[in-house]
Design a protein with these regions (language model features):
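Conserved helicase motor core of P-loop NTPases
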Residues: 1-113
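C-terminal accessory regions
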Residues: 100-265
Length: 265
């Protein structure tokens, strides 16, 4: 039922049955404060995300450790603005602040190294061996990994003598994790989150409500939180924004939503 309702609101359809389903997931401020610590708050405002994460991190007694992203330019002729724009498009932090005991979320898929985008865990150790740094993370599934920095490459396809080749313009190295207490809806795209609270205050972009709700892996551990002084159903309907062209596309085409299919599996 959850995935069926998600599919419908993605197309801009809403009726009393769908509204009743999502209203049953609503929690108030008191209920939010009583939730387990392993829930992730998803909201649209970066300032609120930072405030939540900073507050939770400050309550840990272990020392603060900072990791600065390392940027490597392959050519001095590369436009600095272009590089910075590219780095901002990556789901990493320029300065990553962590403590032992902090709950973190992985921001990329790296199946070979044993983690995926949206998976979570607790930091158990930070170790330094020669010129390498490792972060020991106990994942929620009980498996511990020693995380190394992830290297992202800025590439362009170029042609030389009728041959195409990939030219690396720059690279950036950073641990592909963030604090998992709160994340913006925008930065959560592609993630699959086990225990999720969707703060739907200040939803303002087309499709943003769908993106937030569809991050949930398990509808049984999905909560919806908002603080507006209006009826939940009226507010939910008011933020279900979509493009008419999107609805027409779904009406005229048959397709599989691979993201929802993967979550169901």
């Amino acid at each position: 039922e959850f995935y069926g309702n998600l599919s419908l609101i993605r197309q801009g359809f809403l009726d009393d049955k769908i509204l009743n389903f999502f209203e049953n997931l609503y929690i108030n401020t008191k209920e939010l404060e009583e939730l387990d610590d392993d829930y992730t708050l998803l909201c649209s405002i970066n300032k609120k995300v930072n405030a939540v994460n900073d507050d939770r991190l400050s309550k840990l007694e272990s020392p603060l450790v900072c990791f600065k992203a390392e940027i490597c330019k392959e050519s001095k002729d590369i436009d600095e603005h272009k590089i910075q724009t590219w780095i901002k498009s990556l789901n990493i932090l320029d300065e990553l602040k962590l403590k032992i005991g902090a709950r973190v979320i992985f921001c990329v898929n790296n199946w070979d190294k044993g983690y995926y985008n949206g998976e979570q865990g607790i930091i158990e150790s930070i170790t330094y061996e020669e010129d390498k740094t490792y972060i020991g993370i106990m994942k929620n599934n009980g498996i511990k990994i020693m995380l190394e920095p992830y290297v992202f490459f800025m590439e362009e396809l170029e042609q030389n003598n009728n041959e195409m080749f990939i030219n690396v313009l720059a690279s950036v190295s950073q641990f592909p994790i963030k604090l998992a207490y709160a994340i913006t809806i925008h930065k959560s795209q592609g993630m699959s989150i086990e225990k999720l609270v969707c703060d739907i205050d200040h939803i303002f972009e087309n499709g943003q409500l769908y993106v937030a709700l569809s991050r949930a892996i398990n509808p049984a551990t999905l909560k919806i939180y908002f603080t507006k002084r209006i009826n939940f159903k009226a507010y939910f309907a008011s933020i279900l924004k979509f493009d008419i062209s999107v609805r027409e596309f779904y009406q005229n085409n048959d397709f599989l939503d691979l993201e929802l299919e993967n979550n169901i599996i």
